[in-house]
Structure formats: structure tokens, C-alpha cells
Amino acid sequence: MMEKYHETDADLKDLSGKTIAVIGYGSQGRGQSRNLKDSGLNVIIGIRAGKSRDLAKSDGFETYDVAEAAKKGDVIMILVPDENQAAVYKAEIMPYLTENKCLMFSHGFNIHFGQIVPPANVDVIMVAPKGPGHMVRRTYEEGKGVPALIAIEQDHTGNAKKLALAYAKGIGATRAVVLETTFREETETDLFGEQAVLCGGVTSLIKAGFDTLVDAGYAPEMAYLEVLHEMKLIVDLIYEGGFTKMREAISNTAQYGDITRGPRVIGNESYEAMREILYEIQSGEFAKEWILENMVNRPTFTALTRADEEHLIEEVGSELRAMMPQFKKN
């Protein structure tokens, strides 16, 4: 079983007197930084000039170029996109990564796949909230928190776990639960979840269901409502209480169809495809493919994204959502 940590297991004093340099001010950067600041910790932002820097300033932070922030920081949390981290690290962080500093991540991709190789005389840790930045912030403001993972790759100072737990407490994660993992486990399971289930699996399943109904002559609007719009209702129930709560809330007809037809949709071929996807992640094949894709300016990424944006389900969804008051901006 995984080690689990809560409020009493972490102490913000382990970060007192230290400067936390958060590199990047996107969704996670903004959410984590504001929580840390409101927890009484000293946070600065390392970011290039632009709208995000202006936003960080308006949120009350001291902002610096990345190199200057890395120089000032005792703890350096890298929250720029995965594909940019290695270049930013080599050019603007590595020269200032002196002994006993702490290098921190919220995803293990670049450490696990060797794109960033820190010196041996620093701590290398991960604190990974299991939710987007706006949720990290919102739950904190509500007096709650999102769960998080911590991992220790290097413990040069002997205090790496204390720092990880203190940071997790600073962003509100110990109000929920903090689980200890490894960079390898977090990276491989996170990528698999995104590709096979949460993003790739769900979107492909929805499109397949939509296309099946439309090809059979049903109205695209009906297909959209049945396979996409109602998805949130089901997922919310599962999120709140697992499959049991969801099945308690649906009709007996729906439940019978669920337990007898679902395994025909996600059958042996799907399991085999999932195993292949997991192997591509474990072997580094996916990482290599994604790194090379970025080196040539993402032609496949751009083409496939454009194709999905032009799918009929997006056109129909846009029209229907425009009629629904819950999606109208005030």
C-alpha cells in the first residue's frame, strides 16, 4: 500500500526562510503560487515578459526573468510545459543550481526520460496535485484541497521529504491526502491515464458513439446529447461515489445495458491496445516520439488537432451549447 500523509505529517516551518521560485505562471503556476503565498511562504515568479508576467504582478508577486529567479530561489519549482522544460532548465536554471538547492516538478516526464539530469548535490522532488490549477486554487479557498503525489528522486540534504510535504501542505493538498510514489510510477501512470482513458480513450469513445448514431441516420443533435452532453452527469456520479453510486442513480434498464453491453465495447481488443500503449510509455517510445514531434514543430499534433476541431460533433456541440443558459457568459 502507498504511504499516505495528512495535515499533521507536514510542517510549513520546513520551508520558512526559504525562497520558492516558481518558474511559469500558467494554470498550475498560478494556482500553486497563490496558495503557497496565502500559506505564508515566500514565493517569487520566474517568467518572461508578457501577459502572464503582468498577471503575476497583479496577483501581488515579485517577478523576475527565469535565470534571476533561479538564482534567488532555494526551491525551484518548474511549471512550464513539459516540452519546454529541458531547454529552460539548461539555459536558465542549471547555471544557478548550486549545492543544497531543491529542484521540484509537478510531473516526472523530463526526469524519468532523462531530458533533465540534475547535479548530484541538490534535492530533486515532485509534488503533483491531482487536479488542474484552478481547482487547486478554488478548493484551497474553500478550506479544502486536492490530493497530491510526492516523490523523491534525490535526497542530497536529507530533508527532501520534509520539503515535499511542506510544499504539499502549502498548496492545500494535505487537507485531502498526499500519496508517496516514484518519478517512474507517476510518469508512466499519468501518461497512460491521459492516453488510454481520460483524454484519448474518452474522446475516441465519444466520437465513435456519435459517428455510429449519425451513420445510422439519427439526428446529429440527438447523437450529441446522448453520447457527449450526458457524459458529465455520469462522470460526476462516478467521481462522487464510484460505480456503485452511479448505478444507484440510473435506471435498471441503463444498469443492465451497462453491465452486459459495456464489456462488448471495451473487450479484449481494447485491453490489448491498452497494453501496447502502456509498453510504448514504459519503453520510452512515446517520449521519443513526442520529443521528436516538438523538434520538427509538431506537424502531426497540428494536423490531428485540426481534424478533430473540424469534426461534426464540434459544430453540433457549439450550436447546442449556445442555446443552453449554463454555458452563456454573463
Curated annotation (Swiss-Prot):
- Annotated KARI C-terminal knotted domain residues: 182-327
Q: Which InterPro entries match?
A: 6-PGluconate_DH-like_C_sf, KARI, KARI_C, KARI_N, KARI_prok, NAD(P)-bd_dom_sf
- Catalytic residues? H107
Per the entry, what this protein does is: Involved in the biosynthesis of branched-chain amino acids (BCAA). Catalyzes an alkyl-migration followed by a ketol-acid reduction of (S)-2-acetolactate (S2AL) to yield (R)-2,3-dihydroxy-isovalerate. In the isomerase reaction, S2AL is rearranged via a Mg-dependent methyl migration to produce 3-hydroxy-3-methyl-2-ketobutyrate (HMKB). In the reductase reaction, this 2-ketoacid undergoes a metal-dependent reduction by NADPH to yield (R)-2,3-dihydroxy-isovalerate.
Reactions it catalyzes: (2R)-2,3-dihydroxy-3-methylbutanoate + NADP(+) = (2S)-2-acetolactate + NADPH + H(+); (2R,3R)-2,3-dihydroxy-3-methylpentanoate + NADP(+) = (S)-2-ethyl-2-hydroxy-3-oxobutanoate + NADPH + H(+)
Source taxon at top rank: Archaea
- Domain KARI N-terminal Rossmann: residue ranges: 2-181
| Protein encoded by which gene | ilvC
Cofactors, names only: Mg(2+)
Residues involved in Mg(2+) 1 binding = D190, E194
Swiss-Prot/TrEMBL keywords: Amino-acid biosynthesis, Branched-chain amino acid biosynthesis, Magnesium, Metal-binding, NADP, Oxidoreductase
One biological-process term from Gene Ontology? Answer: L-valine biosynthetic process
> A single Gene Ontology molecular function, please?
ketol-acid reductoisomerase activity
| Binding residues for NADP(+) | Y25, G26, S27, Q28, R48, S52, D82, E83, N84, Q85, G133
The UniProt annotation places Mg(2+) 2 binding at D190, E226, E230
The UniProt similarity line reads:
Belongs to the ketol-acid reductoisomerase family.
Identify the metabolic or biological route this protein is part of.
Amino-acid biosynthesis; L-isoleucine biosynthesis; L-isoleucine from 2-oxobutanoate: step 2/4; Amino-acid biosynthesis; L-valine biosynthesis; L-valine from pyruvate: step 2/4
What is the protein name stated in its UniProt record? Ketol-acid reductoisomerase (NADP(+))
| SUPFAM superfamilies recorded | 6-phosphogluconate dehydrogenase C-terminal domain-like (SSF48179), NAD(P)-binding Rossmann-fold domains (SSF51735)
Manner of cofactor binding, per the entry note: Binds 2 magnesium ions per subunit.
List the NCBIfam families. ilvC, PRK05479.1, PRK13403.1
